[in-house]
């Protein structure tokens, strides 16, 4: 195939295309989109014939779905006199092709291998490389033809499957969409062009190829000329028109070289289409030249963004790998040190968690904000309980006086009444205190479990060991704390405080009461103090409120201290002791270091991705 590119540009073309082909063969397309030309068309649009004419080899053709997998067609122009060379690769298979006539058979075998024998399709890529003096420097991706109706043996939704596969390629901004449309159909109704317009409404990355100009109805030739002149449906990249071998010429074994000569003669001699030939819009050689120029320009334009994307992906992959860690070493001595480091880091973070210090691992966990909130709620509960107590004292004191008053003369405080009421009030606080303990114990347990999950990601046995210890320590320490709390409340049943403390509280309470109560008139004052029972009641209320204030202040501090010591501080210390004890059990080391298969394979995949991206970056730097 004669290529009209000048020598200077040819020297630039191959390296550009080779760069992208190298990146694609590295598998970089798994990580980001690469510049490409995707070929799409309705069934029987002449798509295969165009690709055959460009590549110089026969591709699978026939009725129904012929292209059943995306086919990457890498064409490399060789010097005159150099031998034809072919290679096909897919999945883990790679095979040299000695004879151009074997290409069609090899593609069919690959499609049967990947999409199953029959008429199914697959998203997996087949790569076909062709080196020849008769091909342009060009890489295309051929996609299955758009099917409207399922045929025998095909799933009912085959049309949707194909469209989904096509969209996956053509929606990428890095892809030039080559839309093949026969001249003898209404271009506006072709599904391939409609799909291209959906993803590229302005037509900035869509190039139209008209085929089968020999089948144009008489009188409609000018419409074809108008389409190619971009006057019907506008595409920024415009249109080309080609005439490939028809079925009759294939049956007559007309060679591709002869078909190119016939195509040239057809356009030059055509009454209406010759103008398109003169303008450089017609024939396969002109199409090859345009596609090569378009691809190279597209690659050059995409390179800066590609470099940015690779850098971003490298950074992202490094960060992900850090989360998965390095994995256990192979050497047995190093494995022990690896386990020691892992367990020590976890236990140190557990201690830091219990003291409110920053975690070495960098994990964002904080148990103290929860404790502060919960202890604040406990203090609020005590205050509200005191307010309720104050409100009901008057009625209850009167009832208790009737029940417990003995031989005392009027005006004397009944200590028994005072004691019973205080004990009853404090007793009501016991269960809320135990409930608060359990809530905080659960919250602390959850935080330690989160720390274990973060510290032992990918090591299920080590994580299980830590979780088992956390659950056991939680049960024991919670039980001990509950016992201590209940003992505290038993001690609170002894009505006691230092005389000076009580006197101070009583004086404070009297002062508050006097400040809150308006000064009574002499008449009212004499009435109040002449009523012995009322005087007793007023004084009793002062004593009750004063003592409750002392007791509640004790409980406001003591309950949180018990909880914090046993449920957090002692919990962390015990967890540290037991986890470090695990390191003494030499027989369990291998079991503990057994890695989660998914994590191991994920790390391996990330390491491969990192190598792939670093190699890609080096290609771009060297380019």
UniProtKB/Swiss-Prot annotation:
Residues 31-304 form the Dynamin-type G domain. Keywords: Cytoplasm, GTP-binding, Nucleotide-binding. Induction: By polyinosinic-polycytidylic acid (poly I:C) and viral haemorrhagic septicaemia virus (VHSV) strain 07.71 in muscle, head kidney, spleen and liver. It holds the Pfam family Dynamin_M. Residues 537-623 form the GED domain. Its main location: cytoplasm. It is found in: Cytoplasm. Does not inhibit strain RB-1 of the fish pathogen, infectious hematopoietic necrosis virus (IHNV). This is Interferon-induced GTP-binding protein Mx3. It comes from Oncorhynchus mykiss (Rainbow trout).
């Amino acid at each position: 195939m004669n290529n009209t590119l000048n020598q200077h540009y040819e020297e630039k073309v191959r390296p550009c295309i080779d760069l992208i082909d190298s990146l694609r063969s590295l598998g970089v397309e798994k990580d980001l989109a690469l510049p490409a030309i995707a070929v799409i068309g309705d069934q029987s649009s002449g798509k295969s014939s165009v690709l055959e004419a460009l590549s110089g080899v026969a591709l699978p053709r026939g009725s129904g779905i012929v292209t059943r997998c995306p086919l990457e067609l890498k064409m490399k122009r060789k010097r005159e006199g150099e031998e034809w060379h072919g290679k096909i690769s897919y999945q883990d298979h790679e095979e040299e092709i000695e004879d151009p006539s074997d290409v069609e058979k090899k593609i069919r075998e690959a499609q049967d291998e990947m999409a199953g024998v029959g008429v199914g399709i697959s998203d997996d890529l087949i790569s076909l490389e062709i080196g020849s003096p008769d091909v342009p420097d060009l890489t295309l991706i051929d996609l299955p033809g758009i099917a409207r109706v399922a045929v025998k043996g095909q799933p009912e939704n085959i049309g949707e499957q194909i469209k989904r596969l096509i969209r996956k390629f053509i929606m990428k901004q890095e892809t030039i969409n080559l839309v093949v449309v026969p001249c003898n159909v209404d271009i506006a109704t072709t599904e391939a062009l409609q799909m291209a317009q959906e993803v590229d409404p302005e037509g900035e990355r869509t190039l139209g190829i008209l085929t089968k100009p020999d089948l144009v109805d008489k009188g409609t030739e000018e419409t074809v000329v108008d389409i190619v002149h971009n006057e019907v449906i506008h595409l920024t990249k415009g249109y080309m028109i080609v005439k490939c071998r028809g079925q009759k010429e294939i049956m007559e074994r007309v060679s591709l070289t002869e078909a190119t000569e016939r195509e040239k003669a057809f356009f030059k001699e055509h009454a209406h289409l010759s103008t398109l030939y003169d303008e450089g819009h017609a024939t396969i050689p002109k199409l090859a030249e345009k596609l090569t120029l378009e691809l190279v320009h597209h690659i050059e334009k995409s390179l800066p963004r590609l470099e940015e994307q690779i850098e971003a992906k490298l950074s992202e992959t490094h960060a992900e790998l850090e989360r998965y860690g390095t994995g256990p070493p192979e050497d047995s001595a190093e494995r022990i040190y690896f386990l020691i480091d892992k367990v020590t880091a976890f236990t140190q973070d557990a201690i830091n968690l219990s003291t409110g210090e920053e975690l070495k691992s960098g994990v964002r966990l904080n148990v103290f904000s929860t404790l502060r909130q919960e202890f604040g709620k406990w203090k609020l509960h005590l205050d509200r309980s005191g307010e309720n107590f104050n409100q009901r004292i008057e009625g209850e004191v009167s009832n208790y006086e009737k029940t417990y008053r003995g031989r005392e003369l009027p005006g004397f405080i009944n200590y028994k009444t005072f004691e019973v009421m205080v004990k009853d009030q404090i007793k009501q606080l016991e269960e809320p205190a135990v409930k608060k303990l359990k809530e905080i114990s659960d919250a602390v347990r959850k935080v330690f479990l989160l720390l274990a999950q973060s510290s032992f990601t990918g090591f299920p046995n080590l994580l299980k060991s830590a979780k088992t210890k956390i659950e056991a320590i939680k049960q024991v320490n919670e039980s001990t704390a509950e016992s201590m709390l209940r003992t505290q409340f038993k001690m609170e049943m002894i009505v006691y405080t230092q005389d000076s403390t009580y006197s101070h509280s009583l004086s404070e309470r009297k002062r508050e009461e006097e400040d809150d109560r308006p000064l009574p008139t002499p008449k009212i004052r004499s009435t109040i103090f002449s009523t012995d029972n009322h005087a007793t009641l007023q004084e009793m209320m002062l004593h009750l409120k004063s003592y409750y204030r002392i007791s509640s202040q004790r409980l406001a501090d003591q309950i949180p201290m018990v909880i914090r010591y046993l449920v957090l501080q002692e919990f962390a210390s015990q967890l540290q002791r037991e986890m470090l004890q695990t390191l003494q059990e030499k027989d369990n080391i291998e079991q503990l270091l057994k890695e989660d298969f998914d994590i191991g394979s994920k790390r391996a995949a990330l390491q491969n991705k990192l190598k792939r991206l670093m190699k890609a970056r080096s290609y771009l730097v060297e380019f």
